[in-house]
Amino acid sequence: MGTTVTAKDVQVLRQRTGAGMMDCKKALEETGGDIEKAVEYLRKKGIAKAEKRADRAASEGAIVALVSDDAKTAALVEVNSETDFVARNEEFRALAQAVATQVFGDAGFDGVVTVAQEGELLKQPWHKAPGKTVADAVKEASGKTGENVVLRRYARFKSDGVIGSYVHHNGRVAVLVDIAGGDSPAIKELAYAVAQHIAAGVPKVPLGIVREDVPTAIVERERGIYEEQARNSGKPENILAKIVDGQVNKFYEDNTLLDQKWVRDDTKSIRQLVADAGKEAGAALTVRRFARFQMGEE
């Protein structure tokens, strides 16, 4: 018995790949209805372009970034609600701000927790009300709003260099970036510029800072797709390896921060931007890490 393909699955696949309706239907039939495998199937056939990266959950809420005056400590928090109506509510926004303050003040924590329920924050005493936990404060917000309010994720960076932050004007994307090697005003400006670039997600949201940061499994998956596309292109066998190597190199250029072209000036890479700033400051600068939160993103 063949796989039953629903119109909803076809629509999801079309949105993710830009492929036609019948191509999407066939891809789902060939892959047993598995959307991820169908995306790969379409790409191998050359029907779909590289998937538009954006995990499109429809969550609303608030993202808050806090940075100390000396730019050495920062916090980033995402709190979700079900509707934009609640997300714009003053009490909800005050909750998000207060959670960010709680994270900022947690001197024992440094890093990123991508699933808040797996971290320690929700268990901590709530700094605004002794006797309650952070989880209690979030539950109270749910009760007041009538919506499922969720602390989604959070980050706290402590740096001996500088931390730059950028929050997009719509409040749906925010970034922290930690740069080591100095803390002059020029380096703070660099940190802001790099954070702004990461927020823009152009050409892609970086998978890592350098090529070695990109998981091998992702690179091998892409290489496999490029190899099949090359074989299907009808081009001479003796040039296929060179074509594939070029595509893999382009993948790295698009997906690693230091290789990316700067969003403000595409004649310069982020690596060059950092090197130029270091030369001006008389310091060897390193982008140590970053955190990027986009509203509702998986």
Where are the model-predicted features located?
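N-terminal assembly/interaction segments in proteins that build large macromolecular machines
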Residues: G2-E298
